[in-house]
């Protein structure tokens, strides 16, 4: 059938704007959403009347069909077929192409389920996608009918429709089994079933929820007959495959030997924008964007429109300044290392049709809503964390499938660039033309040694090859076993059934059984689990075996096995610290950091810096080159308290065996920032990680959340309270979305609350802002003590203190004093002052930082005015009237 409303059915839930167009009206519709209002209510009517009875499957289908018709949506054949199968109680595996309306079918399933009184789940692999779907469903079904659970976020958890990560549902299935209140589940991005680390969470619900209806959807499923047969066997319901729908927008393919710049220019001339240029590293994406920015990508009208659309965005960070220039040229950048506000801006500009070109990574395949006409692959190989290899068919189709905008394009375009040596050879051949003599003289370039290459045949095979059959992944962990034991009864038998009925090979099942035996033995030996034989009833046959019951002897921590599984260890480990120690606060921070996920790009930068310092020191000490190379392998980033934490964790695991599923990772990121008195911008500059500032921000947001949520009040000294305030201030100022999301968790009114108006306070977080200023000024003291004049010039050139002026000031200082001290006294409050007298009227603080000298004269320092509005907007201190020198001279100025 034809799709009569432009792109509506294909983007009902996943589109940024389409879902909101389905809400509105007055009265009930405005409150619950236009579709949610058609379902019998799950809540007690306020007027005391009898609620409408639950609908039959046919009635629910009819209401959904009428709802789509009222909005001018004519269902495609495969959509109607899938919805009718769901109404009949069948499972559906929906493997139709990108843009073929899977989201609308999922919406229909969720509505029909809730209208029949069933609790429904929508699962996705990443929190960002769960959050996006949650807000879209709220618009259509109404805020009272939709909840969200993502480990660190709990909103309206009693709602009839729950959006959650796959692991949330899997853990519920293990904990509650057949008795779980799960009527139907729409599993998005089901190809994650084959993910080596996370695939278990997609398989477990299929094996443990026999009364649940499933819809499994992905554009790159491959052969799923084994999964369908397993689902039918476990549930007794039919499983229908809907996998042969045509692409709404067909794809054309081209393998090119032109340079990337030439390819883009030709595509633009042919009217094939917008283009998404796929790279397999963040650095490569930025390099291409910077190269293309000089090619006149955008028209004057587009540049003006981009400038207008982006004017509300602050580009205060180092990468932000780069991005602002690129966007002004019509070129976007999109990858996971960016701040959320920058990624969202690029997506919004793309959705408005303002960006002709986006340079990004292969994250294009999951969870971003960017309309694209042409996908350009810069390579057909990628580094998978272990080695360079060619793309798999599923990876290729995930990326290529995003080309073509339904309702806008008659076709989508997928272009693959040849390897560099092949492009060079093509240039030589073109230059030689048809001259046989010149052609014979050509010395063709070869691929570099060890280079994993590709060619046109590689591209054609990827186009023709169906996605690989999903390889099932099941694992057995302490956490999973604990969850199964929570049900009571014979938990070991249930784990055996889980393994035996899985889709793993016989060899894999045997290994999993051995692993399960080991875990049960560990849990029983440690006293966490007890195994009891219950004698048969008196009237049972004489040969009846006793029933087996497994039970927990401990209370599990709240949110067990969710997003912060090591929080209980952290609470126990804090007892090892001496509150009277000078290093107490920093050591506590190191313990928190050891429980957080590694920000790998940041740690790699730390390791590079540590090795550079070590190499310079060894060279200065006269160590031979070969020995330097050998020794440098042992140098890595700082790991505070590593020995103490390792010993404590080993002991903890003996008492809490499920902790063996996880591992500590000592590191010093937040601690290093604090000890070097760095703000966000300064730390990025120090490590040279401008392209990974989003990674650093997410890490700091997690550290803030852990410090604020997990560390007991009685363990917080004054300094730690200051640090928590400062950290929250920094994260909010740089990009508030990461903190706001979890702080609003559990508060449904936050979804439609207006922003606060008329706040009298000039400074929203006085403690945090004060520490930000103190750290910024003491960082300058530290740099001055180390004679890092160039760094000082880079920090302060905007306020008139260039490198040359700093050098003159320090030369004058050293004529009077030997050194600049940076000990505890030098950092104390006595050496720093704030005059807040002009805060209300001028929105400035007058600040003064004294340099501590060996004679105790305290006659040299920094004075300046802090622009409070700009500082709070950007998360870094913005100065006015900034000066450095002897106090007498500064006061005269």
Regions found by a protein language model. Name each.
Residues 1-84, 88-92, 297-328:
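Helicase-associated low-complexity/disordered flanking segments
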Residues 2-5, 9-21, 332, 351-352, ...:
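Non-catalytic terminal extensions of ATP-dependent helicases
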Residues 65-67, 72-250, 256, 274-299:
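Conserved P-loop/Walker A NTP-binding site and adjacent catalytic elements of P-loop NTPases
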Residues 121-123, 131, 138-147, 283-357, ...:
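Conserved C-terminal RecA-like helicase domain
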Residues 158-174, 329-343, 349-369:
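Conserved two-lobed SF2 helicase motor
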Residues 254-280, 287-290, 344-353:
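Conserved interdomain hinge at the start of the Helicase C-terminal
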Residues 374-377, 381-383, 389-430:
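Conserved segment of the helicase C-terminal RecA-like domain
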Residues 852-893:
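Compact beta-sheet-dominated globular domain cores
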């Amino acid at each position: 059938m034809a799709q009569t409303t432009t792109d509506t059915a294909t983007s009902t839930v996943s589109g940024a704007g389409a879902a909101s167009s389905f809400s509105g009206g007055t009265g009930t519709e405005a409150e619950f959403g236009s579709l949610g209002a058609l379902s019998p209510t799950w809540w007690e009517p306020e007027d005391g009347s009898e609620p409408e009875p639950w609908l039959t499957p046919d009635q629910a289908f009819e209401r959904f069909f009428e709802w789509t018709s009222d909005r001018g949506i004519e269902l495609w054949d495969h959509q109607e077929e899938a919805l009718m199968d769901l109404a009949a109680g069948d499972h559906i595996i929906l493997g139709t192409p990108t843009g073929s309306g899977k989201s609308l079918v999922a919406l229909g399933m969720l509505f029909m389920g809730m209208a029949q009184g069933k609790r429904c789940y929508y699962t996705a692999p990443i929190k960002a996608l769960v959050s996006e779907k949650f807000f879209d469903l709220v618009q259509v079904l109404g805020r009272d009918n939709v909840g969200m659970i993502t480990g660190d976020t709990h909103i309206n958890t009693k709602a009839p429709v729950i959006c959650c990560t796959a692991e949330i549902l899997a853990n519920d299935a293990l904990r509650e089994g057949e008795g779980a209140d799960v009527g139907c589940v729409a599993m998005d991005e089901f190809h994650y079933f084959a993910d080596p680390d996370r695939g278990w969470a997609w398989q477990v619900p299929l094996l443990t929820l026999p009364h649940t209806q499933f819809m499994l959807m992905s554009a790159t499923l491959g052969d799923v007959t084994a999964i369908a047969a397993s689902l039918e066997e476990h549930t007794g319901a039919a499983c229908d495959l809907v996998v042969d729908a045509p692409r709404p927008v067909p794809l054309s393919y081209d393998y090119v030997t032109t340079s990337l710049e030439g390819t883009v220019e030709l595509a633009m001339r042919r009217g094939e924008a917008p283009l998404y240029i796929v790279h397999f590293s963040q650095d490569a994406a930025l390099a291409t964007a910077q190269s293309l920015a000089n090619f006149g990508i955008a028209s004057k009208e587009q540049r003006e429109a981009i400038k207008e659309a982006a004017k509300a965005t602050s580009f205060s960070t180092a990468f932000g300044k780069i991005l602002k220039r690129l966007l002004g040229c019509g070129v976007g950048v999109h990858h996971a290392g960016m701040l959320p506000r920058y990624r969202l801006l690029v997506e919004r500009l793309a959705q408005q049709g303002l960006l002709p070109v986006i340079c990004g990574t292969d994250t294009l395949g999951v969870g971003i809503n960017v309309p694209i006409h042409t996908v350009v692959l810069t390579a057909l190989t990628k580094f998978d964390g272990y080695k360079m290899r060619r793309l798999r068919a599923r990876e290729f189709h995930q990326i290529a499938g995003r080309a073509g905008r339904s309702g806008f394009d008659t076709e989508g375009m997928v272009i693959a660039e040849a390897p560099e040596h092949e492009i060079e050879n093509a240039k030589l051949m073109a230059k030689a033309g048809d001259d046989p003599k010149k052609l014979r003289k050509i010395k063709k370039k070869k691929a570099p040694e060890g280079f994993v290459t590709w060619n046109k045949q590689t591209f054609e095979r990827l186009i023709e090859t169906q996605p690989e059959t999903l390889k099932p992944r099941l694992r057995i962990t302490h956490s999973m076993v604990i969850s199964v034991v929570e049900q009571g009864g014979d938990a070991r038998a249930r784990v055996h059934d889980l393994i035996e009925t899985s889709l793993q090979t016989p060899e894999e099942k045997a290994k999993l059984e051995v692993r399960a035996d080991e875990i049960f033995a560990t849990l029983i030996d440690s006293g966490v689990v007890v195994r009891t034989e219950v004698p048969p009833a008196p009237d049972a046959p004489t040969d009846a075996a006793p029933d087996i019951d497994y039970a927990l002897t401990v209370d599990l921590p709240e949110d067990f096995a969710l997003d912060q599984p090591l929080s209980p260890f952290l609470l126990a480990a804090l007892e090892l610290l001496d509150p009277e120690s000078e290093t107490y606060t920093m050591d506590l921070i190191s313990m928190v950091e050891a429980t957080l996920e590694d920000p790998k790009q940041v740690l790699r930068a730390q390791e590079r810096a540590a090795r550079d310092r070590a190499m310079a020191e060894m060279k200065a000490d006269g160590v031979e080159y070969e020995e330097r190379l050998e020794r440098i392998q042992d140098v890595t980033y700082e790991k505070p308290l590593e020995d103490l934490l390792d010993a404590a964790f080993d002991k903890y695991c003996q008492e809490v065996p499920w902790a063996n599923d996880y591992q500590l990772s000592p590191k010093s990121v937040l601690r290093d920032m604090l000890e070097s008195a760095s703000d966000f911008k300064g730390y990025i500059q120090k490590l040279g990680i401008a392209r990974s500032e989003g990674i650093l921000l997410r890490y700091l947001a997690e550290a803030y959340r852990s410090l604020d949520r997990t560390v007991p009040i009685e363990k917080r000294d004054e300094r730690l309270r200051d640090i928590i305030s400062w950290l929250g201030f920094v994260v909010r100022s740089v990009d508030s979305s990461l903190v706001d999301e979890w702080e609003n968790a559990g508060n449904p009114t936050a979804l439609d609350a207006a922003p606060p108006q008329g706040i009298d306070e000039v400074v929203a977080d006085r403690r945090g802002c004060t520490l930000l200023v103190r750290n910024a000024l003491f960082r300058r003291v530290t740099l001055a003590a180390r004679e890092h004049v160039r760094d000082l010039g880079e920090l302060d050139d905007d306020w008139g203190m260039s490198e040359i002026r700093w050098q003159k000031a320090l030369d004058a200082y050293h004529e009077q004093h030997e050194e600049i001290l940076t000990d505890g006294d030098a950092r104390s409050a006595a050496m720093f002052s704030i005059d807040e007298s002009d805060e209300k009227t001028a929105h400035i603080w007058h600040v003064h930082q004294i340099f501590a000298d060996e004679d105790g004269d305290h006659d040299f320092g920094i004075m300046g005015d802090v622009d409070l509005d700009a500082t709070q907007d950007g998360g870094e201190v913005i100065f006015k009237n900034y000066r450095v020198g002897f106090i007498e001279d500064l006061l005269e100025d």
